Amino acid sequence: PISFGFKIGGRLQADYDQFDGIYTRNGNTANEAYFRRAILEVSGVAYTDWKYAFNVDFGESGSSKWDEASITYTGFKPVNVKIGRFDPDFGLEKATSSKWISTIERSSIYDLADWVNDKQDGMGIQVSGVAGNLFYGSAGFNRAKGNEDVNGKNNNTYNLRGVIAPMAEAGNVLHFG
């Protein structure tokens, strides 16, 4: 096992749109261009059992924000404990990588239940693990920043995910969950 290591990376995704007169207020054609994502990433391992990931997004909003800032302890094999700011383990796209999504739009459940699948600038903890090459499970707790009820009490989100993958080999995966 690697005791210490790090990698630096990033991604840049740009969007360009051309509108005909139907979609503009004045009836004229228009266009826009912007960076959907402009992310700088630093991740790695320390003391063999500790992983870290820090990502800053300089994208669409014009200001920078931490997309992820998390530390994971991997010493309880096969269970991992992650704490910090990260996307909850909600769907396949976020569980694998947002760099390599199969389509530009995520499934509708992300919009239908957005309160349970987004960190919303908050913090959380997640416990996840695998059993053989067949089962994966995770449980998470997140508290979104500025998400209080009318009495000022923080609203929390809880996620539970289970996956069964009867076929999981390079290039071929069949999974449920």
Give names to the regions the model predicted:
Residues 2-177:
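Outer membrane beta-barrel
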